Amino acid sequence: RLFRRQRQMCIRDSPYRCPPGPYERVSMTAHLLKAKNPTAKIIVADPKPKFSKMGLFQEGWGSHYSGMIDWIGSEFGGGSVSVDPDAMTVTIDGEVTKVDACNVIPAMKAGRICEIAGITEGNWAPVSGHTMQSRIDENIHVLGDASAQGDMPKSGYSANSQAKVAAMAVRGALTGSKVFPAKFSNTCWSLIDTNDGVKVGATYEATDEKIAKIDGFVSKTGEAADLRKATYEESIGWYSGITADMFG
C-alpha cells in the first residue's frame, strides 16, 4: 500500500508534540512518493486554520511536489473527520474518500505516570516556569512534552532547555547554591526536500503565570538554496550536539 495512489493524514488540534512534525512527515512522504509513484496524492485533514511554518511548507510543497498534496484546514471541514479502517475510507465533512494508507495522529496527553502521580489538569501537568515544579505537588518536577508550561512548543529542544532549569532548581534546593532566573530557548528545524531545511525558534522567560515568549525568528519564503542547505546542515549539527549534551 505504501506506493499506491491515495494517502491520508489526519492531524490533531493543538497542543501536540512537535508542532511542525506532521507537515515534515507529509513532506518526507511526498519525497518518497515522488520517486516511487509521482501520480500519488496526499490528503491532509487538519482541524486548524493555520500551522507552524505554514507559508514555508506550502511554498515547498508547491515547488517540490506540485499537485501532490491537498491540505484541508478547518475552513473546509478538516476538523470534521471520521475513519473506517475496515473499508479503508476517510470521511471529511461528509465526503467519503477511499484511501490506500491513512496516518491518523491521535489526541495527545501526558504519560500515564503523571496521571498516577495525580499531577495533571486535563491532558497535561501544569508547572511553575521558574523551577519546572508541578503546581500540584512541588516535590515533583515535570518537563518536556508532559508539562503545561505556557508558550514553549512540545519539542526535544524545549525539553532539553527545561531540563537545565529543573536541574538548577533541584541543585539549589539540595545544596543552597545560587539559582539564576530561568531562561529558555527552542528551535525546530524541518526538512521539506533534499537540502531544503527551514526553522522556527524563540527565547523565553519564566513569569509567575507561565513560560512566556520574549522574541522569535522563522525562515523566510523565497530563501536561496545555499541558505536552505545551511539550515539543514545546522539541524544535523544540533542533533549531534544535543545527544552529546545528554549522553556524553
Where are these regions (language model features)?
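C-terminal auxiliary extensions adjacent to catalytic cores
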Residues: 201-248
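A structural signal for isolated positions on well-ordered beta-strands in alpha/beta enzyme cores
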Residues: 8, 41-43, 141
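Single conserved hydrophobic/aromatic residue that forms the stacking wall/gate
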Residues: 1-11
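Short FAD-binding loop at a beta-strand-to-alpha-helix junction that anchors the flavin cofactor
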Residues: 133-152
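Histidine-anchored nucleotide/phosphate-binding helix
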Residues: 22-35
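A Rossmann-like FAD-binding core segment of flavoenzymes
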Residues: 34-123
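A conserved FAD-binding loop/helix module that cradles the flavin
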Residues: 146-186, 190-192, 201
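Cofactor-binding loop segments of dinucleotide-utilizing enzymes, especially the Rossmann-like FAD-
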Residues: 12-13, 47-49, 145
